[in-house]
Amino acid sequence: MTRTASSFIQKNMVADTFSCSHQSVTVRRICLAALLLFALLPARAQMWDSLATSDYHIDTAMVRVLRVEVDNLTFFRDNEYSSQMTKGYSLPGLWIEPRLAYTPIRQIDLEVGLHASLFHGANKYPNYVYHDIGRWKGSQYQRGAHVLPWVRARAEFKHLTVVLGNIYGGQNHQLIEPLFNAETNLSQDPEAGMQLLWDRKHLHADTWLNWQSYIFEEDSHQEAFTVGSSWKVLPGNQEKPLRWHIPVQLVIQHRGGEQDTTSMGVQTIMNASAGAGLTWTPRNRKVLTSVNAEANAMVAYQQSGSIWPFDGGAAYHVGAGVTLWQRLLLRGGYFNAPKHFVSLYGNHFFSTLSVRNGQSYDGIGTAYAHVEYSHVFARRYVLGAEGEFFQSNMTGHSETNFSFGVYLRVNPSIIIKRWK
């Protein structure tokens, strides 16, 4: 496989840059993971939604109010991988977004600021997009932190919200687990472009364009952008204890551009999925808060280019979870790709193409278990921890891997001036 193909499937730049050699899994490390996971105070489950999503509706109480918003996520994550699919590595660091925000009228909101990523022990950072974009500018560096400008404009209608600039990305898209690795919330650059968010009683739709790499005349790298659409159909009465939903999702990445002087040509690859899910919420929630299950079918397709050594493939995924005491989430599932499949932004254990050695396996089956626990101090202040275990089986090879992480989100809002 070419170096281009290998760099493409490396979803997370930081994982490659700060990768470390894997050490054998020991009882001490497993005990440390368990201690960090369960030594937290009671709270509620759905940790990543609390840690990495934001409300995109305009707060009408903030009309004609100038304020400072600070969003911060501090994290320590350790991926103890002894895998043919990917490398083991740790992510110790934080990102912070200080922003100046103003809402001139009820339908318009403006924000401007900076996004800075910092990894403990690093003092200079390569200047390229931190999310699966090749090493085009690896000789250019920033010192101290990886810093980007941050600008967002929102316009809100009755059922539609239009976002330009830095969009509500990452966890906000609510992509299914095999198509999106939640770890990406820690290390990716803020998504930027445009977004349409549509809300009706029986439908939530998120359609976006994330422009990842811009090129100038006769530039030496490719233009790159991702287009996505995530629909959640909500049939029936969603107030009932037992309710169901239909997720339909599409993610396309395109590389090329008429100004491109490279010889790589146009490259377009995609993932698509459709499925169905059930959620049951008992009336007495003292212990059992909710039970959910979901099944999805997925396809991967290479419309043009040669990033993948195959043109397409299919996979399926089933998963179930239970929330206890409104604070503890236990989840498990199984992913299977009978022949070929690559997840553009998912975990490497949900792909048949190895990022470690470039090998393409004829099929993969991954069973996994996930436990998470979080403490919500207030709406904008969340402490969480999680542990994940993966059992993957490929042709002639099987492996067990685990990871754990601890995260703290702090998101204060400070009013500077209010006009009547």
Regions flagged by a language model, labelled:
Residues 1-50, 196, 402-414, 420:
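Bacterial Sec-dependent N-terminal signal peptides
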Residues 34, 108-155, 177-178, 353:
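Surface-exposed loop and membrane-interface regions of Gram-negative outer-membrane beta-barrel proteins
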Residues 99-118, 197-208, 290-294:
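Surface-exposed extracellular loop regions of Gram-negative outer-membrane beta-barrel proteins
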Residues 97, 101-106, 141-161, 165-170, ...:
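Subset of outer-membrane beta-barrel
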Residues 54-79, 110, 293:
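Transmembrane beta-strand segments of Gram-negative outer membrane beta-barrel proteins
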Residues 73-95, 125-126:
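Surface-exposed strand-loop-strand hairpins of Gram-negative outer-membrane beta-barrel proteins
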Residues 161-232:
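Surface-exposed coil loops of outer-membrane beta-barrel proteins
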Residues 47-48, 71-73, 93, 150, ...:
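Exposed, low-structure sequence patches enriched in small/polar residues
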